[in-house]
Amino acid sequence: MGGIVAATGPGSKAETQPATDGTAVADAGAYAGAPAPPDRVVLELLSPELPWLMAIAFIAGLVDAAVGGGGLIQLPGLFTTLPQHSPAALFGTNKFSSVFGTSAAAWRYARSVRFPWRPVLFAAGAAFAFSFLGATVVSLMPKDAVRPLVLALLVLMLGYTLMKKDFGALHRPRQVGRRELSIALAMGALIGFYDGFFGPGTGSFLIFLFIRFFGLDFLRASAASKVVNLATNIAALSFFVPSGNVLLLFAVPMAAANIGGAVTGTQLALRGGTPVIRKLFVLLVLVLIARMARDTFGH
């Protein structure tokens, strides 16, 4: 007589029960570790959250390409939309999708804007290496101790930018020598460590430092920051992907949307130039200060 195979529990033997239609039907999904059936995969692909997450990814890519700070939009969107998933999986999904948008923005900027490649590549190499170090010590240092310092740096950075009306307005690149390359290495190491350990405001800090130490205007500083930010994102993915902490069913469509936003944001930045990017930069830093103040004093 035919029967239906059902698992009574993890590791238990299957029990055979009579089938009402006289046939033997195997319930493959009853076994622990069985792959999800195709219809379930389709349902996840058609998840009602996906269009919303793609819209968030598009906006994040647009903002990030122009002035940085896309993570301030995309990461909270993931946490509020997919609260059932682990933080590591959401961080990995955010990095996976954003690395494609950052790549698209870096490529568009590199083809349209000239900036000194040597210090940028030195900074990118150091940032890639030190982002690993930042990620490894993330559990050893309390983040609450870092927030007041970051808040103070953001306030100083905003004050400096507002007081110097010509800050980043003109492109006055400095001659690149050993001193400048040493500064680029130190800058990349600090930013890479910070991005691997903490993260918020990485793009804003990079733009500020490229203007302050290399004489770039806002447009070229934003372009240079994308190359360094791309290095830190790739380093982060080398942690998240091997450990399986990327929700590919969401990450891949979000990556496509992020690319679309990045292309749009880059085009807006190139058309608007330094004045537009400066205004967006000040606005973004204000948002960062408000968020950091809330996290620091809101407990």
Region locations from a protein language model:
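Transmembrane helix exit motif
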Residues: 104-114, 135, 151-176, 287-299
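Membrane-interface alpha-helices at helix entry/exit sites of multi-pass transporters
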Residues: 85-94, 118-122, 215-226
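Hydrophobic alpha-helical transmembrane segments in multi-pass integral membrane proteins
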Residues: 133, 190-198, 236-244, 251, ...
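Cytoplasmic-side transmembrane-helix entry/capping segments in multi-pass membrane proteins
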Residues: 116-126, 174-180, 223-228, 276-282
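Lipid-exposed faces of alpha-helical membrane segments in multi-pass integral membrane proteins
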Residues: 55, 59, 100-103, 125, ...
